[in-house]
């Protein structure tokens, strides 16, 4: 056996209640496990118990027993734990210690005083396993998200650990790169027979390759330990607010009942013939949704080009319009130039060529401050935006910069906080809030300035499905009830499908397409160019022999929105 928890509990010293409660779990050598559950359920805490961070670096009270490779972890120091369990973190940048990829992989070997020649051979062999040999002399900080992930994997594999722990490895990756990461993890598992544990919100992406068991947690306890087929046939995912695979949701939307015998865990194994008549009937009976009429242009981007180094173009001749009241997505792979567009719109960067207009007014000579009177930007990580200790002061800061009277500020801030679901927190310190609540604070900071356009960079990154749904419902309400024009930058294809009608896709630093989402998502070759992937919704429609796949996608999304 690799891992055994016996009545194991853990409580952080700073918290009143335990984060892990009476965990009883056995993971056998060579198993591949997915660990899922809502944010704060104890997934990462359980992982930190495995790699020794708890209790050696993170203090708290433990009870019960944890055995790794038949050794009681109470008797082991941190070095011993990390020699058995290798961890790949969600934030790969925080894991790098070398100036080059080769140095980073070799770090653990240097600490063990391995001879130089032997070290080179081990680094070379490890780099081969994750396809890094061509970039061993590159800085890890200059790599793409997928390459960084592989460097982190190599850094823990070089130690020849028995257990590989991946903590949300897909959180920052575009769909195609995420699938490649899951394939690499699967190959490592098959080639080495190591025990693999994947902590992740994106269950459908994890199930891109076979999993032995899925462990589901809630409020510090294990509430399910099942095979993927058994779990997906059960109502547990829906009951506990965890997003199920799209094809499962679509089959259920047609009124079908799924059992474990239908092999639902993987699209390649599910018995689709059984469901085909009902799915076809549902599609032909459902009413086609009507699209909203297009309003006047609010933001116009014309022939925009930019280069960070004056040589290689980050954006090349990009043009698009955003209409008043629209909810639009900008999509593309990591490093395609999506975030650069935001910086150019806000004036943080100056375009090499091209013009940006807002309500017909050229923004070229407007300062960042002037642009911020009409355009709000919410960054992916709220901690990178928040600069005040108290919530009220944070939301009031923009109004104070404008010189507004304090009495007016109080009225506006309290109204905005109430709108954002933060009314009772206005005297709270920011540090007391959850990640999702902090995100709402950053949105409130923009909304109080009454912008015409709100741009959100990866608004749901790192959030579980419950908080994801709450955040997007709030953003959708701003769009529908206030008429606020919203642009989201995202590579979450489920999010874009469900909440936006139009997407602007950037690939190889150019505009690849600007079209309705259901049209884009029914074109595999186009998606592949942008490092995106077809959804299982497309695969289902194709397998059913449905001719108008874009209409099928549109009908399903309308059904999902109606039943939310």
Whereabouts are the PLM-identified features?
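Conserved catalytic motifs of ABC-family nucleotide-binding domains
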Residues: 160, 450
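Conserved ABC transporter NBD signature motif
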Residues: 59-71, 354-362
């Amino acid at each position: 056996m690799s891992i055994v928890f016996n009545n194991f509990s853990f409580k952080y010293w700073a918290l009143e209640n335990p984060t892990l409660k009476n965990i009883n779990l056995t993971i056998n050598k060579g198993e591949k496990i997915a660990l899922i559950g809502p944010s704060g359920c104890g997934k990462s805490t359980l992982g930190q118990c495995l790699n020794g961070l708890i209790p050696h670096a993170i203090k708290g009270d433990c009870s019960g027993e944890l055995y790794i490779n038949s050794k009681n972890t109470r008797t082991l120091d941190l070095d011993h734990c990390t020699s058995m369990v290798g961890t790949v973190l969600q934030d790969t940048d925080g894991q790098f210690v070398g100036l080059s990829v080769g140095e980073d992989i070799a770090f653990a070997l240097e600490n063990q005083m391995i001879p130089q020649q032997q070290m080179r051979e081990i680094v070379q062999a490890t780099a081969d396993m994750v396809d890094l040999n061509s970039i061993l002399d590159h800085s890890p900080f200059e790599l793409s998200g997928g390459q960084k992930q592989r460097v982190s994997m190599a850094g823990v594999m070089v130690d020849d650990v028995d257990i590989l722990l991946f903590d949300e490895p897909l959180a920052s990756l575009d769909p195609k790169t995420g699938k490649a990461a899951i394939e690499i993890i699967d190959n490592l598992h098959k080639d080495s027979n190591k025990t693999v544990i994947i902590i992740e919100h994106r269950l459908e992406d994890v199930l891109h390759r076979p999993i032995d068991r899925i462990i589901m947690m809630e409020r510090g306890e294990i509430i399910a330990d099942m095979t993927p087929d058994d779990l997906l046939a059960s109502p547990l995912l829906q009951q506990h607010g965890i997003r199920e695979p799209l094809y499962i949701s679509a089959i259920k939307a047609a009124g079908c009942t799924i059992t474990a015998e239908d092999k639902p865990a993987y699209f390649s194994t599910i018995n689709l013939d059984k469901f085909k008549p009902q799915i076809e009937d549902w599609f032909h009976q459902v009413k086609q949704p009507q699209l909203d009429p297009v309003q006047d242009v609010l933001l116009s981007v014309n022939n925009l080009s930019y280069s960070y180094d004056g040589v290689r173009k980050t954006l090349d001749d990009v043009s698009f319009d955003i209409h008043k009241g629209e909810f639009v997505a900008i999509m593309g792979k990591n490093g395609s130039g999506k975030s650069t567009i935001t910086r150019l719109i806000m004036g943080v960067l100056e375009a090499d060529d091209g013009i940006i207009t807002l309500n017909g007014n050229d923004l070229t000579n407007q300062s960042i401050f002037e642009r911020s009177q009409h355009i709000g930007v919410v960054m992916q990580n709220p901690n990178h935006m928040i600069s005040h200790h108290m919530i009220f002061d944070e939301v009031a800061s923009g109004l104070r910069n404008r010189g507004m009277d304090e009495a007016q500020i109080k009225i506006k801030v309290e109204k905005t906080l109430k709108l954002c679901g933060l009314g009772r927190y206005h005297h709270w310190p920011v540090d007391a809030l959850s990640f999702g609540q902090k995100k709402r604070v950053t949105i409130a900071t923009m909304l109080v300035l009454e912008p015409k356009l709100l741009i959100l960079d990866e608004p749901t990154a790192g959030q579980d499905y419950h908080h994801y749904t709450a955040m997007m419902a709030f953003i959708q309400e701003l769009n529908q009830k206030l008429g606020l024009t919203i642009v989201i930058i995202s590579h979450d294809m489920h999010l874009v499908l469900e909440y936006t009608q139009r997407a602007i896709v950037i690939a190889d630093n150019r505009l690849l397409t600007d079209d309705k989402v259901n049209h884009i998502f029914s074109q595999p070759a186009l998606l592949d160019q942008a490092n995106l992937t077809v959804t299982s919704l497309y695969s289902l429609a194709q397998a059913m022999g449905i001719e108008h796949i874009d209409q099928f996608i549109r009908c399903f999304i309308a059904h999902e929105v109606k039943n939310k």
